[in-house]
């Protein structure tokens, strides 16, 4: 009789490979109108991730699936900044994210009581919570960047895992080989990833390999213990159109593909992060290349922004790219606000960025034929045909703004709006089919 104990099942991928459907898989299946076995199979082979830290599950989080055949998810970035440390303002942003349909919140706090804010966020929000431990490392360890050790960085990763973070962006792919390519490529915008630039600086000063790459197995051990999904950060994403699809971006993507396989072998769920800035005609091919190189792992992208000159309107430039990227294979969109490249976004910026990204994600889901993606659109068409404004608000992605604008400009003719008033095409045709006389030159 064998005395060898069976390995402990901890992560969603562990259970999926053992043929077990978890409550989280069932929840995702119900929300996505999929069979639970469809979800289990794709979690098992890494095509779907369910970022759900075991600590956060106990606090009542909702389960969200990211990946193949599922609706495109949307993330909101927020957090306390050193130049504008206002926790109350950040909590307003959390409320907006929850009320207006975000699926995830990334806490990018890098100043002040970061752990207190993070813990309270995880206690209170049912959404997925992500972080970037590298942002927190300097303040958490109370050391200058170049004095941080491998053990310091792993301690920060563990602290975030213990707090209940569901997914962590960790820049594991920027190793010495990728840096060599970066230096030889001659980029216009160099490295625009904040976490990636910090690691590049640390590596240049110390002469050491990226500790997240060199000690990747130890990172995976922590992630497995708490079922943290590792979101492999793309340090060398293009920060302008000129740099898109260059050798450096591709070199790092190849490394990220290798790291995907190592994570899956360790029973850790994975997502891979992508661009960035990219011309419209390059996006679809880039999505397909990433899926190929990273073995169909869920792809999490920032836009991409399709022009570099939309300053003040980058929620629009990113939404255009986001619709293309998500319809071409990306699974998760990080929102971009009108404040991008300019300042810390305020609450209105967050709403504008979230809605632009939600629209992009929804448009992509219709194109991808995600089950029931078009249901609300069809219901909206029916409501508009009937001029049923209350029904329209129930279909709208942002019913608050729509209703507010409508009521601010009341029409003289009941059931219409001030754009057309009595000449409303829908009203006219309805009256014809109802057998009502139409005479736009006189009162009805």
Where are these predicted regions, by residue range?
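Catalytic or ion-coupling anion/metal-binding cores of large enzyme and transporter domains
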Residues: 180-207, 238, 242-244, 344-444
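C-terminal catalytic subdomain
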Residues: 309-318, 324-370
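Alpha/beta enzyme core
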Residues: 3, 11-309, 313, 319-332
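Hydrophobic alpha-helical segments with strong N-terminal bias
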Residues: 3-6, 313, 349, 405
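Basic/polar N-terminal segments that are highly enriched at the extreme N-terminus
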Residues: 1-10, 442-444
């Amino acid at each position: 009789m064998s005395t060898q104990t069976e390995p402990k099942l901890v992560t969603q991928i562990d259970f999926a490979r053992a043929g077990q459907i978890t409550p989280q898989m069932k929840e995702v299946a119900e929300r996505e109108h999929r069979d639970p076995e469809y979800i289990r199979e794709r979690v098992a082979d890494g095509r779907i991730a369910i970022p759900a830290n075991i600590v956060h599950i106990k606090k009542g989080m909702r389960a969200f699936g990211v990946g193949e055949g599922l609706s495109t998810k949307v993330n909101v970035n927020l957090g306390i900044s050193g130049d504008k440390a206002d926790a109350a303002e950040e909590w307003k942003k959390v409320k907006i994210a929850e009320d207006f349909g975000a699926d995830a919140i990334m806490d990018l706090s890098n100043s002040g009581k970061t752990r207190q804010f993070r813990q309270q966020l995880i206690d209170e929000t049912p959404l997925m919570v992500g972080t970037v431990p590298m942002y927190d490392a300097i303040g958490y360890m109370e050391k200058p960047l170049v004095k941080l050790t491998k053990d310091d960085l792993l301690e920060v990763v563990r602290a975030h895992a213990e707090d209940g973070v569901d997914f962590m962006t960790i820049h594991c792919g920027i190793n010495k080989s990728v840096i060599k390519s970066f230096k030889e490529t001659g980029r216009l915008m160099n490295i625009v990833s904040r976490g990636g630039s910090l690691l590049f600086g640390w590596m240049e000063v110390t002469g050491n390999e990226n500790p997240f790459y060199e000690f990747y197995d130890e990172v995976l051990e922590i992630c497995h213990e708490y079922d943290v999904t590792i979101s492999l950060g793309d340090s060398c994403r293009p920060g302008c159109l000129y740099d898109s699809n260059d050798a450096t971006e591709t070199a790092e993507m190849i490394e990220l593909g290798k790291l995907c396989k190592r994570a899956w072998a360790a029973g850790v769920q994975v997502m891979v992060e992508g661009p960035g800035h990219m011309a419209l005609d390059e996006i679809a091919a880039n999505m397909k290349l990433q899926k190929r190189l990273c073995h169909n792992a869920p792809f999490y992208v920032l836009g991409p922004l399709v022009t570099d000159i939309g300053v003040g309107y980058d929620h629009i430039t990113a939404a255009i790219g986001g619709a293309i990227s998500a319809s071409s294979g990306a699974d998760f969109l990080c929102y971009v606000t009108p404040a991008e490249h300019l300042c810390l976004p305020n609450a209105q910026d967050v709403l504008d960025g979230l809605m632009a990204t939600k629209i992009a994600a929804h448009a992509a889901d219709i194109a991808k034929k995600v089950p029931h993606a078009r249901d609300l659109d069809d219901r909206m068409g029916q409501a508009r045909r009937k001029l049923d404004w209350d029904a329209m608000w129930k279909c709208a992605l942002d019913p608050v703004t729509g209703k507010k604008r409508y009521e601010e400009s009341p029409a003289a003719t009941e059931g219409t709006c001030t754009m057309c008033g009595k000449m409303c095409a829908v009203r006219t045709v309805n009256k014809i089919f109802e057998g009502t006389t139409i005479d736009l030159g006189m009162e009805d």
